[in-house]
């Protein structure tokens, strides 16, 4: 007598970000969305790479606790200018300050990605860096961009997939999707390692 094969795991995106959902949809896999409710405050002396890795895993584990047979994707991103972490500005004034500071400078974006296999209790976490060289921007250009794009929920006040491309002089990194918030190249690798091939 043949035993029934186990049900495949459910793919779950632990995010409220429409941008991440849009990126994940590009892989053509069925998935569910469950927004995590976590404290995203950095720990004392926490470095950017450690912060995004911790938050990505925390998001995936919090959502995974409700799903007994799932592959849960958590992701988090920060932008770093010099020694300062640029989070989501949330207001127009904060976004103005961030983009004034970024004008003519190099900003490093770090995207943490975690895949939790709830059946096995395993988590794999990676951090994908990306470097953005901003053009010298006038006050008028910054204001025009913010009025049109309103990137107040985006790390560093910047959306590369939209009008934000007009702010950029140069990009450097392995996966442009990481800038939007979900590194699909690394995610494909993690899914395949978990026995969930994309192709």
UniProtKB/Swiss-Prot annotation:
It comes from the Bacteria. It catalyses: N(7)-methyl-GTP + H2O = N(7)-methyl-GMP + diphosphate + H(+). Keywords: Cytoplasm, Hydrolase, Nucleotide metabolism. Gene3D superfamilies: 3.90.950.10. It is found in: Cytoplasm. GO terms for biological process: nucleotide metabolic process. InterPro entries: ITPase-like_fam, Maf-like. The record marks 19, 77, 161 as: Important for substrate specificity. Its cofactor is a divalent metal cation. It holds the Pfam family Maf. GO terms for cellular component: cytoplasm. GO terms for molecular function: nucleoside triphosphate diphosphatase activity. Its EC number is 3.6.1.-. The active site is at residue 76. Nucleoside triphosphate pyrophosphatase that hydrolyzes 7-methyl-GTP (m(7)GTP). May have a dual role in cell division arrest and in preventing the incorporation of modified nucleotides into cellular nucleic acids. Belongs to the Maf family. YceF subfamily. This is 7-methyl-GTP pyrophosphatase. It comes from Nitrosococcus oceani (strain ATCC 19707 / BCRC 17464 / JCM 30415 / NCIMB 11848 / C-107).
């Amino acid at each position: 007598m043949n035993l029934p094969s186990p049900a495949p795991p459910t793919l779950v995106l632990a995010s409220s970000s429409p941008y991440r959902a849009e990126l994940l949809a590009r892989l053509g896999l069925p998935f569910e969305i469950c927004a995590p409710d976590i404290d995203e405050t950095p720990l004392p002396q926490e470095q950017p790479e450690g912060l995004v890795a911790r938050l990505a895993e925390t998001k995936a584990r919090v959502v995974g606790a409700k799903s007994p047979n799932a592959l849960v994707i958590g992701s988090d991103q920060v932008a770093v200018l010099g020694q300062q972490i640029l989070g989501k500005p949330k207001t127009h004034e904060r976004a103005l300050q961030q983009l004034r500071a970024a004008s003519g400078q190099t900003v490093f974006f770090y995207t943490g990605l975690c895949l939790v296999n709830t059946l096995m209790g395993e988590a794999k976490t990676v951090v994908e860096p990306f470097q953005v060289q901003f053009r010298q921007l006038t006050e008028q250009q910054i204001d025009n961009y913010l009025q049109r794009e309103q990137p107040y929920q985006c790390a560093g006040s910047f959306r590369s997939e939209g009008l934000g491309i007009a702010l950029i002089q140069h990009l450097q990194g392995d996966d442009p999707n990481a800038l939007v918030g979900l590194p699909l190249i690394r995610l494909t690798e993690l899914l395949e390692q978990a026995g969930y091939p994309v192709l």
